[in-house]
Amino acid sequence: MSITPERKQTLVKEYAQKSGDTGSPEVQVAILTERIVNLTEHFKTHVKDNHSRRGLLKMVSQRRQLLDYVKNRDEPRYKSLIERLGIRR
């Protein structure tokens, strides 16, 4: 269910704005998206796992807040981010 450190590093390198950037909204959204995808796969086999479902909903909410922040600050950056991540919004 969690992301391996190697996968997290590749996400940080791919979405970082500059070298050493681990906290930008783009990086945070990319990591949250990866975790959301993993949990969605988990729920295909564990339908009744409601405790993890709550965590999923919190992650989706956090990602939504970060995406709204990016959209309010810089809309072209927001559009490129959701396109790169494949988020349907």
From Swiss-Prot:
One of its GO terms (cellular component) is cytosolic small ribosomal subunit. It comes from the Bacteria. One of its GO terms (biological process) is translation. Keywords: Ribonucleoprotein, Ribosomal protein, RNA-binding, rRNA-binding. CDD domains: Ribosomal_S15p_S13e. Signal peptide: none annotated. The keyword Flavoprotein does not apply. One of its GO terms (molecular function) is rRNA binding. SUPFAM superfamilies: S15/NS1 RNA-binding domain. PANTHER family: RIBOSOMAL PROTEIN S15, BACTERIAL AND ORGANELLAR, SMALL RIBOSOMAL SUBUNIT PROTEIN US15M. Part of the 30S ribosomal subunit. Forms a bridge to the 50S subunit in the 70S ribosome, contacting the 23S rRNA. Belongs to the universal ribosomal protein uS15 family. One of the primary rRNA binding proteins, it binds directly to 16S rRNA where it helps nucleate assembly of the platform of the 30S subunit by binding and bridging several RNA helices of the 16S rRNA. Forms an intersubunit bridge (bridge B4) with the 23S rRNA of the 50S subunit in the ribosome. This is Small ribosomal subunit protein uS15. It comes from Methylocella silvestris (strain DSM 15510 / CIP 108128 / LMG 27833 / NCIMB 13906 / BL2). The gene is rpsO.
